[in-house]
């Protein structure tokens, strides 16, 4: 599981400590559909979502809103914090350039992760070192100070990418809102 521990002294001290964007992007790549991604993201057993923005001591449901402009997709991860207010948590950007090369990245909301918190895929066969000190994965985490570099990675083989660019793709519009959630979702304690 990828959940974070509140007791960890290396946390950023921001609400984003409770949702590791590296784990979210990894889950997104492995998902077959947007609905599958949304469901997996919100299941307690995956251990990824531990956000409690409405401060009710229960993990909030993260809804995935799809926006498309030609060959570019934006998947907005949102939490309904009240009946009248939603909070964007992060956005996943998937785009195809004129040479048909597909890129993917996730950008954390500045209020939750700080300014310019961007996770991009890294071309490597081993897990990338995470810059999020709240990350609790199976491997030991090292925080390394290094100049930021941008690496474009071809991600055509990811199941979710094959799905959104297939002729069978239909945009997903989740019907959920504050107080109304899917039957598989059970708000668990943080």
Tell where the protein language model's regions lie, with residue ranges.
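N-terminal low-complexity segments enriched in Gly/Pro/Tyr/Ser
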Residues: 4-190
């Amino acid at each position: 599981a990828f959940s974070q521990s509140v007791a960890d002294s290396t946390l950023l001290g921001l609400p984003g400590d409770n949702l590791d964007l590296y784990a979210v992007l990894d889950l997104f790549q492995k998902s077959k559909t947007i609905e599958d991604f949304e469901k997996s993201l919100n299941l307690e057993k995956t251990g990824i979502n531990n956000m409690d923005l409405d401060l009710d001591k229960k993990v909030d449901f993260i809804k995935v809103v799809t926006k498309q402009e030609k060959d570019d997709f934006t998947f907005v991860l949102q939490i309904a914090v009240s009946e009248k207010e939603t909070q964007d948590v992060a956005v996943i950007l998937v785009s195809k350039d004129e040479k048909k090369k597909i890129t993917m990245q996730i950008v954390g909301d500045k209020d939750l992760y700080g300014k310019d918190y961007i996770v991009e895929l890294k071309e490597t066969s081993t897990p990338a070192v995470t810059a999020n000190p709240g990350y609790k994965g199976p491997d030991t985490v090292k925080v390394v100070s290094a100049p930021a570099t941008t690496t474009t990675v071809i991600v055509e083989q990811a199941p979710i990418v094959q799905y959104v660019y297939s002729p069978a793709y239909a945009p997903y519009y989740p019907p959920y809102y504050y107080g109304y959630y899917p039957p598989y979702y059970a708000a668990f304690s943080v």
